[in-house]
């Protein structure tokens, strides 16, 4: 057991981009190592992502962000065929171990290395979901060009081009889950700081939607 201190990746947000970029690369290298591992036999992971879990995340977003936070009617959203199609598409893809919440607060920097923490939600899923968690993190608020640069670095680390359709699908799904969590924690646990993170997440979602067709 090693004390990793309190220096999360988020704590370095004010650094110059060249320095911060290297920290993100270290984090992505750790994520790729995780994704390259076989499923462990020594201890069970959480139930893998499947169509039902993806649909639950969508309902979570609808209930807490659209309904409770924005005061919108949610039935028409939840009944839209594109959501079922999104869940079915993601559930049909091969899986590997994923962190599920690899945002900047869950990456700690210690002794020049990146360490993944709070991995109790680890399960089978798509690596692109973890990548989206990192580059579209509502806390870190990376600039669009910075996110694009990190995506290019991810392709170098993984050794293969990123499938745009899969990445967009994972990013949409992750952003819905993330925004639902911000609204839920902010309103129901009294942690209003989370509500201030919603606009950045919504902006990422808006930018992804125009090209997000799964047809």
Language model region names:
Residues 46-51, 162-171:
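All-alpha amphipathic helical-bundle segments outside canonical DNA-binding/catalytic cores
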Residues 24-27, 54, 76-83, 172, ...:
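Hydrophobic packing residues in well-ordered alpha-helices of helical domains and bundles
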Residues 213-215:
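Eukaryote-biased recognition of C-terminal alpha-helical segments
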Residues 27-31, 82, 86, 154:
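Structural preference for long, well-ordered alpha-helical segments in enzyme cores
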Residues 79-82, 86, 189-211:
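Short secondary-structure subsegments characteristic of cysteine-rich extracellular domains
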Residues 1-56, 60, 67-70, 92:
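ATP-binding pocket architecture of kinase catalytic cores
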Residues 34, 84-131, 138-142:
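Active-site acidic catalytic loop and adjacent metal/ATP-binding pocket
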Residues 59-69, 114, 127-160, 172-190, ...:
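Active-site activation/catalytic loop segments of kinase-like enzymes and analogous catalytic loops
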